[in-house]
């Protein structure tokens, strides 16, 4: 008995299939150790072969492995460049703990300073005094601030709002005997160069009425007609926010926008050392054969470029040569999904296919580890096609789409395209969107969620309600939760179930649908049938997304690898591993493509 092990080392998962002639004996998989193609990853593959040998009670005669190329999926936080708004400055928006409600515009009045002399802006008391917005520096103390505000209001000073540098907005508001908007966690240094400040707080979920209305804002700031366009641009960025602070720069004052101005989506978000800011000369970029493009605008261009168009990725660590690159702009996804602004962040996600190092002999390394002959007879895409065509009903001319963690491989009878960006890119997008670890995002991305209402009730994405099989932890109340490895996995409080569904599907379209269309355009040719294999192919939602991405008359189905071989089917996974096990075997390879609806397949290349 000659048993061949097909070994497929992926970016996230290592899969092994044992075949004895035309019989599929068994399959197994484990997470890939280290970087794909590294010695650690091959050690993990060898250990998996030995584990499957023990499980099946047999010994492998020889093994097959394809040449390996790794895909890097990175998250680059690139705050969106604030639009030009003239003298208007966006100070903050979307603060989590505001106090009170209302809208007010006035001159800054600093509580840690003496009142201005009579007749100057900010002096209160006499009728006609200028409206003021109180400034509470961090460390001033909420009790002291509230006492000072009560005294000012009692003295007739027209203070209609307060801004706090600390996080004591609610504490200050609760100690006032007046209803006025209080916003905390404000960068008061950004207010220093402003002669007028507008503050608005609305109930959670309600839109702004003053700061999102260009006409009202222009009137509040006494803007001339020439600056009406600046108000319109700024107000457009505040759609969907329920609180915000806007300033009017004083003539000749410092420019807060030069160093402090942030987009609404960055409000309250800490910057990491690698973040690029507007005006940075060292921001990430991509380079094709003809041009160099900054990464953020390139995100909108890459889906229209052919696979392999990007040759170099430049980051703070220096330029890196790549065979392909795919990028995803979360801010653009948010706009397309009509998500509330600021809820998806401003990161650009990049998946790049690194060039294979010269002289890499993965078969030799694996042979030393196993003590067996190991051959590289097929590329990964070719092996995946051979394995996928063992699906019952597969046509010999079918186009196989192997969806992996790092790449989307599209393989036709006469050509193949390997496009960077797949499951890991989606995981990174979900993790960045929800601010959760990637390990949790790997479960959250897979399908529908529910919102836990109390201990045992839930609300589903379609609005239906029901009872949980078992009580949820008290900490999960009010949270979205998805099926996890040990029951419900709570993951978010910021989105409704329906909103998260819309965002999740849009992320899948952006990460998989757009990339698949790019790969198919690069490959060219007709689509008589499309077979989906690989780990992500088990995502029922993703199947629907890809169906909508392709022409309506193209039959698209999920592979059932090994379905025409003897032995149990391996399902939608293990296509490359089974294909490697079949490589070079004429009688076994002839079974690829045979099924109830497919006639005999032509002889496979070997």
What are these regions (language model features)?
Residues 195-196, 414-444:
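Catalytic or ion-translocation cores adjacent to nucleophile or general acid/base/metal-coordination motifs
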Residues 13-40, 415-425:
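Short glycine-rich, Thr/Ser-proximal phosphate-binding strand/loop in the N-terminal lobe
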Residues 389-416:
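Phosphate-binding/catalytic loop of phosphoryl-transfer enzymes
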Residues 1-6, 23, 30-397, 451-454, ...:
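Nucleotide/phosphate-binding catalytic cleft detector across ATP-hydrolyzing
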Residues 402-404, 420-424, 510, 574-575:
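Conserved structured core elements
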Residues 7, 12:
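Residues forming the flavin
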Residues 438-461:
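A short helix-loop
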């Amino acid at each position: 008995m000659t048993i061949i092990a097909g070994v497929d080392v992926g970016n996230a998962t290592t899969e092994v299939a044992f075949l004895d002639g035309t019989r599929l004996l068994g399959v197994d998989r484990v997470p890939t150790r280290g970087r794909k193609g590294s010695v650690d990853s091959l050690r993990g593959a060898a250990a998996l072969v030995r584990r499957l040998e023990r499980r099946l009670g047999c010994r492998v005669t020889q093994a097959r492995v394809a040449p390996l190329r790794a895909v890097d999926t990175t998250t680059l936080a690139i705050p969106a460049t604030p639009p030009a708004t003239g003298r208007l400055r966006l100070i903050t928006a979307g603060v989590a703990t505001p106090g009170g409600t209302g809208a007010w515009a006035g001159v800054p009045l600093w509580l840690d300073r003496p009142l201005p002399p009579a007749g100057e802006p900010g002096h209160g008391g006499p009728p006609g005094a200028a409206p003021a917005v109180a400034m509470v520096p961090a460390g001033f103390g909420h009790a002291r601030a509230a006492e000072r505000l009560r005294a000012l209001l009692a003295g007739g000073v027209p203070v209609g709002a307060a801004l706090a540098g600390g996080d004591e907005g609610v504490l200050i508001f609760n100690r006032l005997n007046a209803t006025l908007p209080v916003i905390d966690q404000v960068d008061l240094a950004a207010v220093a160069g402003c002669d007028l400040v507008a503050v608005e707080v609305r109930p959670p979920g309600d839109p702004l009425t003053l700061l999102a209305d260009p006409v009202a804002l222009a009137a509040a700031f006494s803007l001339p007609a020439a600056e009406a366009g600046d108000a319109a641009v700024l107000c457009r960025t505040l759609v969907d926010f329920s609180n915000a602070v806007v300033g009017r720069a004083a003539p000749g004052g410092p420019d807060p926008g030069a160093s402090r101005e942030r987009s609404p989506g960055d409000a309250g978000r800490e910057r990491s050392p690698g973040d690029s800011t507007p005006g940075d000369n060292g921001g990430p970029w991509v380079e094709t054969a003809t041009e160099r493009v900054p990464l953020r605008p390139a995100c909108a261009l890459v889906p229209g470029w052919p696979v392999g168009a990007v040759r170099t990725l430049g980051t703070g660590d220096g330029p890196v040569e790549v065979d392909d690159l795919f990028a995803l702009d979360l801010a653009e996804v948010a706009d397309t999904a009509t998500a509330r602004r600021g809820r998806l962040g401003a990161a650009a996600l990049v998946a790049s296919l690194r060039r294979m190092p010269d002289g890499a002999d993965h078969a030799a390394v694996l042979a030393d580890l196993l003590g067996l002959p190991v051959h590289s007879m097929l590329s990964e895409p070719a092996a995946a096609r051979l394995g996928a065509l063992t699906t019952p009903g597969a046509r010999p001319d079918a186009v196989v789409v192997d969806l992996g963690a790092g790449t989307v491989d599209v393989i036709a009878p006469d050509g193949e395209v390997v496009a960077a960006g797949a499951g890991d890119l989606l995981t990174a997008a979900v993790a960045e969107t929800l601010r959760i670890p990637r390990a949790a995002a790997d479960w959250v991305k897979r399908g529908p969620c529910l919102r836990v209402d109390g201990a045992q009730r839930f609300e589903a994405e379609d609005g239906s309600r029901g009872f949980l099989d078992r009580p949820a932890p008290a900490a999960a109340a009010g949270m979205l939760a998805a099926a996890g490895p040990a029951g419900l996995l709570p993951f978010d409080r910021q989105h409704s179930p329906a909103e998260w569904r819309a965002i999740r599907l849009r992320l899948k379209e952006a990460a998989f649908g757009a990339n698949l269309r790019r790969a198919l355009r690069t490959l060219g040719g007709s689509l008589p049938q499309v077979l989906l294999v690989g780990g992500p192919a088990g995502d029922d939602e993703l199947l629907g997304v890809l169906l909508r991405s392709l022409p309506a008359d193209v039959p698209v189905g999920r592979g059932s690898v090994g379905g025409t071989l003897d032995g149990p089917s391996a399902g939608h996974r293990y296509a490359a591993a089974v294909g490697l096990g079949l490589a070079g075997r004429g009688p076994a390879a002839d079974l690829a493509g045979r099924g109830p609806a497919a006639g005999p397949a032509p002889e496979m290349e070997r």
